[in-house]
Every structure is written in structure tokens, then in C-alpha cells.
């Protein structure tokens, strides 16, 4: 009992669990402890076992009273009384090893005992709990699969809608194709013409601006030279003032010369100022040219905006394509998730099978280990001569337990022999019954042959 893989319930717990899991209605209400103590009732156990088989395997009630189709029996009506017990044992013999009970026998149906039946019912209830948890997990997996399928359907619908939108954006209606082509051609021509005009005017303005810059630089150089000449003349004048001669004639002549040079310088200065004013007017004309340039720039900006609009439309189409690709990737992910869920279920089934195999193997190992330990204990007990009083009492208890086990084995053998004798007696009775039937059939066939012979003779005589 130490190697059981399920808890051992008492009678009260068994009654509660059976009412909750197996028996419902009046059967569950009528169930009580007296049905299991002191000796369990076979009728109640039949009903519990049948309900468990109906719940797990889906076996209907009429299946217990039907002869299997793969068995040929000459007189099936003779087995009607034993057939429900035989079919119940057949189903329970395959069901109890699943509940981790490997010693279920037909005696447990015909003559049940309290300890064994409580262990069997504990195993059945534990398996039903395990089955319910597995069904809940399976339902969760099915709900997840259903939700993923619904999501995949939604994404496929969104994918199709996006494809339709993309086709609408890419395709131009037949009525507007010519206008669209003309519009695109006009835009390209205008863009080309504006670019050429803008380039020509910008080149001309740049050339004029460069010329004006060069002229202004030349004039400024000339002014600087004139200023330098004035400074040099002032220096010469100062020098000459220091060297003035007292003769008035020379002074007059020198003054006349100086006046002439001053007039020349003034006339040159006026010419330079006039040219400076002209260049200043030309520089003032530059803003109007700049306004024209700004207009051309605005036109080019409008063209750039149109280009940006076209690029935005292209970007939207690309975004739709990206969305379609992302939707397709999500569809692939959902498919991979579905495949992974299927793989998880298969892996869990394999793990369950391996766990069952390991548990069976552990039980066998524990049995072998117990046998080895018992043999070792016997050897140690034989080797030790002087033992304490406690050890002797323990040995006596062990001997008592062994004798009880031996008695149980003897009773088990006796019951097996009794069942075998009953089976042999039933078999011999059936054989005798078959022989009697065969004899009666032979006698009747002989009598029929005699009667037919007599009738034939009478017919011949009549003829």
C-alpha cells in the first residue's frame, strides 16, 4: 500500500465522492455507509462500476446483457444469468490497470471485501478527478484554438480588404485614365519649362550681378586712387607753401595751375558720383528681380508639394503593402502557434504515456526491492543469535503477519479452487446437457426416419 499513486479514502469520503461524481438523483441519495460496512453490497457495487464505465468508456446498460459478436456459442440462452457479471469483469479488467490497480479479480465482484473495495473505489475516484482535470485542460486548448482560428479569419478578412483597397488605389477608372495621363503629362511639361526658365533667369541675374560687382569694385579702386592723389597733392601743397617765393607773378601762376587741377578733380569727382548713383539705382532694381525669383521659387515649391503628395500616395500604398505583409506574417504566426499547440498536446500525451510507464516500472522496482529487503532481513535474522527482547517481539509480530498472509493466501487458493470447481461443474453440466440434447436429437431423427419410411411404404401400397 505504500506504493499507491492515489490517496486512500475512508467510507464517509467515498460516499461523498460517489454522490458527487458517479451516482445522481435517487441512487445517490439512497447511498450510505451501510452499503459498504461491514460487508459491501454487490448490487451497489454493480451499479457504481457500471456508472464509472458509462462515464469513462461510454458503455451503455444494454451492453452488459449482450453476447459479444466475436464469440460463437451454440446455446447462448444458457449464459444469460452469468453474462452481466462476465461482461462487467471484462470491462473492469481493462479499466482497473488504468486506475493503478493491478490485482482486480472476479471474486471482487462476486464476493467483495471492504478493504479491497475501498482501495478499488479510491483508485476509480482518483482517476475520475484526473480525467476531469485533463478534460478542463483539453477544453482550454480547444478554446484557444477556436479563438486563434477566429482571429486568423478576421486577419484574413482584413488582409482581403487591404488588397481590395490597394487594387483600387493602383487602378485608375477607365473614364479617368485619359484625364490622368493628360494631367501627368501637363505636370511634367510645366515642371520642365519652369525648371528651364528658372535656370535661364538665375544664370542671367548671376551674370549681371557679377558684372555690377566687378564695376563697383573698379570704381571703388578708382576712388581710392583719387583719394590717395588728393592726399599726395595736399602734401605737395604743404611743401609748396613752405617754399613760396615772394614774387606775386609766380604765385598767381601757381594759383591758376592749382585752380585748374582742383576743377579737374571736382569734375572727376562729380563723374564718379554720377556713376555711383547709377550703380546704386541698378542695385535698387535688384529687389524686383528677387521678387520674380521668389515667384518662380513658389511655383517650384508648388511643384514640390505636388511631388510630395504623389510621394505620400505612394507611401500610403507602400504602408498598405506593409500592412498586408504584416497580416500575412501574423497569419503565419497563428498557423505556427496552432501547430505548436498541436505539438504541445502530442508532447503532453507522450509525457503522460512515459509517466505511466515510469510509474509501472517504479512499482515493479519497489516490489523487487521489497523482496530483496525481506530476503536480507531473513538472512540477518538467521545470522544473529543473541537478540534483545524488543527484537524478539518484533520477530513474533512478523511471524504473526506472515502467518496471516499465509492464511490469506490459503483462503485465496481455496476460493480459486472453489471457483475452478464451480466452473468445471458448470462445464460438465453444460457438456451433459449438450450430450442429452444431441441424444434426443438423434432419437428424434431416427424416429422421423422410421416414420418417413413407414409413410413411403404406405404410399407405395396405396399406389
UniProtKB/Swiss-Prot annotation:
Q: Where is it located?
A: Nucleus; Chromosome, Centromere, Kinetochore
Report the residues modified as N-acetylmethionine: 1
Alphabetized UniProt keyword annotations: Acetylation, Cell cycle, Cell division, Centromere, Chromosome, Coiled coil, Kinetochore, Mitosis, Nucleus, Phosphoprotein
Superkingdom, according to UniProt? Answer: Eukaryota
Query: According to the UniProt record, where is the region Interaction with the N-terminus of NDC80?
Result: 1-385
Question: Where is the major localization of this protein?
Answer: nucleus
Q: List-wise, which residues carry Phosphoserine? A: 247
User: Where is the region Interaction with the C-terminus of NDC80 and the SPBC24-SPBC25 subcomplex?
Assistant: 386-463
GO molecular function terms attached to this record: microtubule binding
The GO cellular component terms are: cytosol; kinetochore; Ndc80 complex; nucleoplasm
Biological process per Gene Ontology, one example term = chromosome segregation
Which portions of this protein are annotated as coiled-coil regions?
149-341, 389-463
| Family listed | Belongs to the NUF2 family.
Role: Acts as a component of the essential kinetochore-associated NDC80 complex, which is required for chromosome segregation and spindle checkpoint activity. Required for kinetochore integrity and the organization of stable microtubule binding sites in the outer plate of the kinetochore. The NDC80 complex synergistically enhances the affinity of the SKA1 complex for microtubules and may allow the NDC80 complex to track depolymerizing microtubules.
The protein's name is Kinetochore protein Nuf2
Which species is listed as the source? Mus musculus (Mouse)
Amino acid at each position: 500500500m505504500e506504493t499507491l499513486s492515489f490517496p486512500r479514502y475512508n467510507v464517509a469520503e467515498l460516499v461523498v465522492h460517489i454522490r458527487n461524481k458517479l451516482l445522481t438523483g435517487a441512487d445517490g441519495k439512497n447511498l450510505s455507509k451501510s452499503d459498504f460496512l461491514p460487508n459491501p453490497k454487490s448490487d451497489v457495487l454493480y451499479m457504481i462500476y457500471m456508472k464509472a464505465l458509462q462515464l469513462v468508456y461510454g458503455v451503455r446498460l444494454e451492453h452488459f446483457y449482450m453476447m459479444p459478436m466475436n464469440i460463437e456459442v451454440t446455446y447462448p440462452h444458457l449464459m444469460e444469468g452469468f453474462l452481466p457479471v462476465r461482461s462487467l469483469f471484462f470491462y473492469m479488467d481493462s479499466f482497473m490497470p488504468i486506475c493503478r490497480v493491478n490485482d482486480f479479480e472476479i471474486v471482487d465482484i462476486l464476493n467483495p471485501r471492504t478493504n479491497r473495495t475501498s482501495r478499488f473505489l479510491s483508485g476509480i475516484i482518483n482517476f475520475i478527478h484526473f480525467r476531469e482535470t485533463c478534460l478542463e485542460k483539453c477544453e482550454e486548448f480547444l478554446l484557444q484554438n477556436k479563438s486563434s482560428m477566429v482571429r486568423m479569419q478576421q486577419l484574413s478578412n482584413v488582409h482581403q480588404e487591404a488588397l481590395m483597397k490597394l487594387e483600387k488605389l493602383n487602378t485608375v477608372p477607365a473614364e479617368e485614365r485619359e484625364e490622368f495621363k493628360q494631367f501627368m503629362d501637363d505636370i511634367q511639361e510645366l515642371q520642365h519649362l519652369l525648371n528651364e526658365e528658372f535656370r535661364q533667369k538665375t544664370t542671367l541675374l548671376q551674370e549681371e550681378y557679377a558684372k555690377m560687382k566687378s564695376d563697383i569694385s573698379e570704381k571703388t579702386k578708382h576712388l581710392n586712387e583719387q583719394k590717395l592723389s588728393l592726399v599726395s597733392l595736399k602734401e605737395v601743397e604743404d611743401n609748396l607753401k613752405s617754399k613760396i617765393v615772394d614774387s606775386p607773378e609766380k604765385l598767381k601762376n601757381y594759383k591758376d595751375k592749382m585752380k585748374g587741377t582742383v576743377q579737374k578733380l571736382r569734375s572727376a569727382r562729380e563723374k564718379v558720383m554720377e556713376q555711383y548713383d547709377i550703380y546704386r539705382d541698378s542695385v535698387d532694381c535688384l529687389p524686383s528681380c528677387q521678387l520674380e525669383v521668389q515667384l518662380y521659387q513658389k511655383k517650384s515649391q508648388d511643384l514640390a508639394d505636388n511631388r510630395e503628395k504623389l510621394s505620400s500616395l505612394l507611401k500610403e500604398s507602400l504602408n498598405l503593402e506593409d500592412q498586408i505583409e504584416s497580416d500575412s506574417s501574423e497569419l503565419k504566426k497563428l498557423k505556427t502557434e496552432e501547430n505548436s499547440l498541436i505539438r504541445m498536446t502530442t508532447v503532453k500525451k507522450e509525457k503522460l504515456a512515459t509517466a505511466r510507464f515510469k510509474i509501472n516500472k517504479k512499482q515493479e522496482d519497489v516490489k523487487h526491492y521489497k523482496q530483496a529487503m525481506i530476503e536480507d532481513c531473513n538472512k540477518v535474522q538467521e545470522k544473529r543469535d543473541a537478540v534483545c527482547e524488543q527484537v524478539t517481539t518484533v520477530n513474533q509480530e512478523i511471524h504473526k503477519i506472515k502467518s496471516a498472509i499465509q492464511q490469506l493466501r490459503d483462503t485465496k487458493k481455496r476460493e480459486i479452487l472453489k471457483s475452478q470447481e464451480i466452473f468445471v461443474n458448470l462445464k460438465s453440466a453444460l457438456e451433459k446437457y449438450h450430450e442429452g440434447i444431441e441424444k434426443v436429437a438423434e432419437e428424434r431423427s431416427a424416429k422421423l426416419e422410421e416414420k418417413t419410411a413407414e409413410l413411403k411404404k404406405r404410399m407405395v401400397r396405396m399406389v
